[in-house]
Amino acid sequence: ALLVMLISGVIPMSMILYFSVHDSFAGNNFIWVGMNWFQQLLSSSDFYGAFFRSLGFSALIISIEIPLGIYIALRLPQKGFLSNLYIVLISLPLLIPSIVVGHIWKFLTLPKIGLISSSIDYLGVSYDMNNPIIVWITLALMDSWHWTSLVILLCFAGLKNIPEAYYQAALVDGASGWSVFKNVQLPKLKLVLLIAILLRFIDSFIIYTEAYVLTRGGPGVSTTFLSHELVQTATIQFDLGEGGAMSVIYSLVVLCVSWVFFSLIVRRNNGQ
């Protein structure tokens, strides 16, 4: 396990840190530049634009998938054959690779022949993938279709762990459905929801494959997220120094958010 961690984590991160404070020229020649790459990034409008687009996309995804996942989980039967069948069907989108999801939605939104675009055009509404708003809506729908299942499964598992005695007590008190949700189910789901929000933030913040296949970062730079900037810088332009610095900042953001949520999860688990 230690060897796997070393190969998959420590060594790549060490190389990224090395690249982030060096500049390369004439092949494998590196010179020390200190924090120059970081200063250049933190004064770049392109970097800030991509960064805030990534944050905005994560916020949009969480605001859609968490409430939707809770609602669907509440509507599912807790026992019986139908319960098992629904869980299997709901899990299917999670089994589809990201690149396949991107191509599926690319085909669905093709002008004139795509199922989504032609259906909306039939209603008299223009479905133009050159419109940034339409593209963002499409990306949100695609991600929600792919990943809301994860939130549903987590919430469903959390609901199944609520003792029946809580529901019986609420029934005796004459509590309404909303009251049961607010005072019984939601408090018991807080730990699960923290985990769900963390997982969905990380995955949506680093989204690359589906978005790139569907939009190529366009129209313009409207869907050019930080992951696209990183790939463009490090692998297309082969600018290892700037790419390394961007990777470090990227990783620090994810680590800081993960630490905050991990602290909340530990506190919640300890009953604080």
Residue ranges and their predicted role:
Residues A1-Q272:
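A structural signal for multi-pass alpha-helical bundles of membrane permease subunits
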